[in-house]
Amino acid sequence: MQEVISYIQKAVLEISNALKFPDTGYSQNQNFTGDTQLKFDVLSDEIITKTLSQCSSIKAIISEEKDEILTLNEKANFIVAYDPLDGSSLMDVNFAIGSIFAIYEEKASAKNLRAALYSMYGARLELVICKDQPKLYRLNANNEFIFIKDLKMNEKGKINATGGTQKFWEEKHAKFIKSLFDEGYRLRYSGAMVSDINQILLKGGGIFSYPATQDAPNGKLRAFFEVFPLAFIIEKAGGKTTNGKNHSLLELEFDKIHATTPCFFGSEYEISKLLKAYNE
């Protein structure tokens, strides 16, 4: 698996370099779920596909920007699912964005998830790699990823990052969010899931939520590329995840590679509070 991780590092570095002088315009294409693709979405996907295709340990890749699974080496063991550029719609305002990767063994399923990674393209290039414990790495002047620290969640945080159009929230979710603000939680929501999860992780706690809404009853975020890898990282850091019913997002199973789900990531206190609010 280390070989797979090393090729992901190469792809992340190439994307970071390309971001220095990006074309932030839209292409004429849409991805599988109907999102109009930015030209840099397409370029990032091409970079990752090209790079991972050189890795003999990868059986197949699944991309948010591809309709179907792409088989690379049927004799290999690992399947890599990825969001090539999470938060790409924020490129024009120069917010931090990132790439998300999940490494599955043999079959894309939460129970087969063996490692997860995400990169942050911000003021500096950082990479979180998680097998047993999420570890933060930072690119140095020699183009090497240097270990910074292990990431751990506190039992309770102060950050509230909540997505979905507010007028379409269910009443129970609106009440839950209000209760957090009544406790003094701070709103920290950028519109890039990877950036918001990263802030919660590095600050030690809080909650990220993207609930079921009237206009998206099955949620909006994609299980295999976004939800599962970030849930894996949060839980390995000591946090909790749920869809509002289950006690872990990693309990969920889906047949379709572009399946979506409501999702909540956070410290133990916030997730326990949410489950109570959702199931009273």
Curated annotation (Swiss-Prot):
Superkingdom assignment: Bacteria
Binding, Mg(2+) 2: D83, D86, E226
Record: residues binding Mg(2+) 1: E64, D83, L85
GO MF, any single term: magnesium ion binding
Enzyme class: hydrolase
Cofactor(s) this protein cannot do without: Mg(2+)
Ligand binding (substrate): D86, G87, S88, S89, Y189, K220
InterPro entries named among the record's database cross-references: FBPase_C_dom, FBPase_class-1, FBPase_N, FBPtase, SBPase
Annotated localization: Cytoplasm
UniProt pathway annotation: Carbohydrate biosynthesis; gluconeogenesis
Entry's Gene Ontology BP terms: fructose 1,6-bisphosphate metabolic process; fructose 6-phosphate metabolic process; fructose metabolic process; gluconeogenesis; sucrose biosynthetic process
Annotated family: Belongs to the FBPase class 1 family.
Subunit annotation: Homotetramer.
HAMAP family recorded: FBPase_class1
Entry protein name: Fructose-1,6-bisphosphatase class 1
Species annotation: Campylobacter jejuni subsp. jejuni serotype O:23/36 (strain 81-176)
